[in-house]
Design a protein with these regions (language model features):
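Short, flexible helix-loop junctions that flank or precede catalytic/ligand sites
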Residues: 1-138
Length: 138
């Protein structure tokens, strides 16, 4: 029902209050889906933390590490048939990713993303190469 949702869909996470509400909802067992305008999955994680002042960043990283399941970023590119198709970057919150978020070592996440195919991860470049191999894009 509207009063007791299992899934909460938020628009863009623009400010600290909205991000805080999303994290609280996730911590209380809700599946929270939200949008954020960034260049990729790792940048989305950075942005969520960077919105907060320095004295709150550690707490936010801990909350995020405790509730994040995945970040999916998308780009639309021109297809061979003159339509547009999506390229996707997928960051799964594995124990390694969660630990790096908690420790504030975001700069190390791209290496895990690059090599995380077995966990279901994919970079934009890997997505692009797959679409090229399919002949969907040039």
């Amino acid at each position: 029902s509207r009063e007791d949702p299992d899934v909460i869909m938020l628009g863009e996470l623009r400010d600290s209050d909205t991000i805080r509400q999303a994290l609280t909802a996730a911590e209380t067992g809700h599946l929270v889906l939200a949008t954020l305008h960034t260049r990729g999955a790792v940048q989305a994680v950075d942005r969520l933390v960077d919105v907060f002042p320095a004295d709150e960043k550690a707490l936010i990283r801990t909350q995020l590490a405790g509730s994040l399941k995945a970040v999916i970023a998308q780009q639309l590119v021109s297809a061979t048939d003159e339509t547009r198709v999506g390229l996707f970057e997928v960051l799964i919150a594995t124990s390694a990713v969660v630990n790096l978020i908690r420790e504030g070592k975001m700069h190390q996440i791209p290496a895990i993303l690059q090599t995380g195919a077995q966990a279901g991860m994919q970079t934009f470049e890997q997505s692009r190469l797959a679409r090229q191999a399919e002949g969907v894009i040039h």
